[in-house]
Amino acid sequence: MKKTLSETVLCYLKRDDTYLLLFRNKKVKDYNAGKWIGVGGHIENSETPDQAAIREIKEETGYDVHSLTCAGEVLFVNDNYQENMYVYEITDFDGQPIACDEGDLKWIPIKDIDKYPMWEGDKEFLPLLINHAPYFKMQLIYKNKDLIDVLKY
């Protein structure tokens, strides 16, 4: 069976020593339900990853992005689905926050992030993002919702 490939962005807005995370608890049949993740979503046909990141941040948080940095790429592989995700850290933004229809937004101290329920694979790339590692690429292989392998390039 052919795997479906999706291209997405995942964005971590940084303020002082916190990241803005989204607790996925509002959508019906949400694959990410019960997890804390960055904000983001699918890249539209006419968009670059940067454009998608700016749009998704505005839609989900209300913030206006002035500059952004793509920190790396993560390929998620799970059964019949693959997702190529561009990971961003954003420090230059402003505006008034809005309620998100996908979950609850919260500024989480970076030192406490690992205490929140998240995908096991996120724990592989978040330290690279937090520590400003050079541009990273990795592949996270899941079976159902269990991480079974990590390949770093």
What are these regions (language model features)?
Residues 33-39, 47-49:
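Short, surface-exposed acidic-centric catalytic microdomains
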Residues 18, 26, 75:
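Short, glycine/serine-rich, charged loops/turns that create anion-binding
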Residues 43-66, 75-129, 149-153:
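Unchanged
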